[in-house]
């Protein structure tokens, strides 16, 4: 689960990390008063969406102006006008795709005197099963670009969970960032607070980009991005309360309510599969035969008829879907349950696109019988390769 920048900074503030004072507004009329509560004389007006690259992005609407989603105001009146330009508009960045995201919140914060821009992040390294720090002197830009062009400017190391974090980890980060003197002590304290927050809040990723050195020599987190482990949200009610469902794909949101593992993609062939590995293989073979998957969807091993029905409805709600491939290898998941769910969904929402079904495993004959006697226009397949070829042919001709 992701949260907005203003929410991330509130968390940073709780854990003693240095951040600018700021206010969030949802109406342009509130912006002038919000900016007036801050010191000024420079205000930063930021669009709040769950995507990076806001400053380099652009708005679809001409009314929003030609600048990106991070703008500077030199008066409270200008802050109000900038908020008015951005609220309700669609911001497009390299992470949103051409669809973009609507801006429903604006964060106004005090400007900062920037001497240097640095990069600092914590993430779960799945290779080592540890929390890793990533630090670079090249802040204020995409870390992917730095990694590709100047990888030597990135320092990364993990923390042994048995011994935990020590001061030398903080000093290692400080030296990697080129800090000296009192800044090293600030960095050690910051690293301790960030690590404690990362562990206590069950985070998957915490990125501060940029972490700035101000002209007075102090450090400050100028931007923050946080991601949390969905599987741990049951014990993080305060984090769950920060969830902004308007920032999530409606189909992914609906899937989460039925415990379906769904990720929307850009292709034309919808997939319903049981098991993440088989789902990945299904997507790969669709691409192999010349088409693109419209989604990743794992219904899991203990799916019910209702769950399968909902999964099918989510797939068919995507206007880009031109065909559907159901690929089930029944172990715990019974093929007859899948068949009953498909039939129930088709009766409810109809079937306007080709449907290829490949069933194998537990109760496979019963599943095929149920589909065969349903009267549905279903294309049967014997194996995965056969199924992929048939759905691609049905869609592309």
From Swiss-Prot:
UniProt keyword annotation of tRNA processing present: no
Record-linked SUPFAM superfamilies: Glutathione synthetase ATP-binding domain-like, Succinyl-CoA synthetase domains
Catalytic activity line of the entry: succinate + ATP + CoA = succinyl-CoA + ADP + phosphate; GTP + succinate + CoA = succinyl-CoA + GDP + phosphate
Family the UniProt entry places it in: Belongs to the succinate/malate CoA ligase beta subunit family.
Pfam families: ATP-grasp_2, Ligase_CoA
Gene3D superfamilies hit by this protein: ATP-grasp fold, A domain, ATP-grasp fold, B domain, Succinyl-CoA synthetase domains
Coiled coil: none
Enzyme Commission identifier(s): 6.2.1.5
Keywords attached to this entry: ATP-binding, Ligase, Magnesium, Metal-binding, Nucleotide-binding, Tricarboxylic acid cycle
Record-annotated ATP-grasp domain positions: 9-254
Entry protein name: Succinate--CoA ligase [ADP-forming] subunit beta
Subunit structure: Heterotetramer of two alpha and two beta subunits.
Binding site for Mg(2+): 209, 223
